[in-house]
């Protein structure tokens, strides 16, 4: 899922996997989507009026990559969507078939409320408005949200700790032209080797030459989502870079955001955020 500062995405923990992964899976049964959204997507972290804030930074990173025109195609898969949609607001103009995913049914249900425009759905309009502002295409936020809803074709379970993260059902078209993943892998991995293995697993869903847009927490060890206090594997910028290279990517861009003191609100111990744009290397024959 996505977190906020961003805690996490619960993509993936099979109770039949190793003990560390099983422990993570059990902890996530207490995850509360609305508490997570309040902690990370309502003010102060959800205040988009300050361009130096974490929210504008993440949205700007995504918009700038798509503005290059180098990331497009037919099929996009969002890995560990959590209860959030902001990570797809720039992407939806460039892909006609989008799959959202999460390990937790409660997060998939939360996404469904927004996608179906049901009463009580979380209000993402401030984020949609901000993306329209920075993209400057003359598009209204209502048009932006309509397009995203129309292009999300399915919301599926996922387990990034399995060699086939989406299973063998064939419900999502594969391989994807692009992957997005925000605050997922570090949040659902008990240690660095599991994080690297999860990245390798999701990379199998991506075509050679395809792009990964990857956002996550730097040097974070825990975060809160209601009564749940969830462990995170702390990663550094260099460890993220090394994991991408080991999974067969060329790193096109890797940048970091240092969390300012006024946004360290006690809901986690995150030190910063990373954003990576990486391209899966095509094997030469």
Swiss-Prot record:
The keyword Protease does not apply. One of its GO terms (cellular component) is perikaryon. It catalyses: phenylethanolamine + S-adenosyl-L-methionine = N-methylphenylethanolamine + S-adenosyl-L-homocysteine + H(+); (R)-noradrenaline + S-adenosyl-L-methionine = (R)-adrenaline + S-adenosyl-L-homocysteine + H(+); (R)-normetanephrine + S-adenosyl-L-methionine = (R)-metanephrine + S-adenosyl-L-homocysteine + H(+); (R)-octopamine + S-adenosyl-L-methionine = (R)-synephrine + S-adenosyl-L-homocysteine + H(+). Belongs to the class I-like SAM-binding methyltransferase superfamily. NNMT/PNMT/TEMT family. Octopamine binds at residues 220, 268. Keywords: Catecholamine biosynthesis, Methyltransferase, S-adenosyl-L-methionine, Transferase. It comes from the Eukaryota. GO terms for biological process: adrenal gland development; cellular response to dexamethasone stimulus; cellular response to growth factor stimulus; cellular response to peptide hormone stimulus; epinephrine biosynthetic process; methylation; norepinephrine metabolic process; response to activity. Pfam families: NNMT_PNMT_TEMT. Its EC number is 2.1.1.28. This is Phenylethanolamine N-methyltransferase. Expressed in the adrenal medulla and brain. S-adenosyl-L-methionine binds at residues 36, 41, 80-81, 86, 102, 107, 159-160, 182. GO terms for molecular function: methyltransferase activity; phenylethanolamine N-methyltransferase activity; S-adenosylmethionine-dependent methyltransferase activity; transferase activity. Inhibited by 3-methyl-l,2,3,4-tetrahydro[1]benzothieno[3,2-c]pyridine hydrochloride. InterPro entries: NNMT/PNMT/TEMT_CS (IPR025820), NNMT_TEMT_trans (IPR000940), SAM-dep_methyltransferase (IPR053384), SAM-dependent_MTases_sf (IPR029063). Pathway: Catecholamine biosynthesis; (R)-adrenaline biosynthesis; (R)-adrenaline from (R)-noradrenaline: step 1/1. Optimum pH is 7.9 in phosphate buffer. The gene is Pnmt. Catalyzes the transmethylation of nonepinephrine (noradrenaline) to form epinephrine (adrenaline), using S-adenosyl-L-methionine as the methyl donor. Other substrates include phenylethanolamine, octopamine and normetanephrine.
């Amino acid at each position: 899922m996505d977190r906020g500062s961003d805690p996490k995405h619960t993509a993936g923990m099979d109770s039949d996997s190793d003990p560390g992964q099983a422990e993570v899976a059990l902890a996530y049964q207490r995850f509360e989507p609305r508490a997570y959204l309040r902690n990370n997507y309502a003010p102060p972290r959800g205040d988009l009026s300050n361009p130096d804030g974490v929210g504008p930074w993440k949205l700007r990173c995504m918009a700038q990559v798509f503005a290059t025109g180098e990331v497009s195609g037919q099929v996009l898969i969002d890995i560990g969507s959590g209860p959030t949609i902001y990570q797809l607001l720039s992407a939806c103009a460039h892909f006609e078939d989008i799959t959202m995913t999460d390990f937790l049914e409660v997060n998939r249900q939360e996404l469904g409320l927004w996608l179906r425009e049901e009463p009580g759905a979380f209000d993402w309009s401030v984020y949609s408005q901000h993306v329209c502002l920075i993209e400057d295409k003359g598009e209204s936020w209502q048009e932006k949200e309509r397009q995203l809803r129309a292009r999300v074709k399915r919301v599926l379970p996922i387990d990034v700790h399995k060699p086939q993260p989406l299973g063998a059902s064939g419900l999502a078209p594969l391989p994807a032209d692009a992957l997005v993943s925000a605050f997922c892998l570090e949040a659902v991995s008990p240690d660095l080797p599991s994080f690297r293995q999860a990245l390798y697993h999701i990379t199998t869903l991506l075509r050679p030459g395809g792009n990964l847009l990857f956002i996550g927490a730097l040097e974070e060890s825990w975060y809160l989502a209601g009564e749940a206090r969830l462990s995170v594997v702390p990663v550094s910028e260099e460890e993220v870079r090394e994991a991408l290279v080991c999974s067969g990517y060329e790193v096109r861009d890797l940048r970091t955001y240092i969390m300012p003191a006024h946004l360290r609100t006690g809901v986690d111990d995150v030190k910063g955020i990373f954003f990576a744009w990486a391209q899966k290397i095509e094997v030469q024959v």
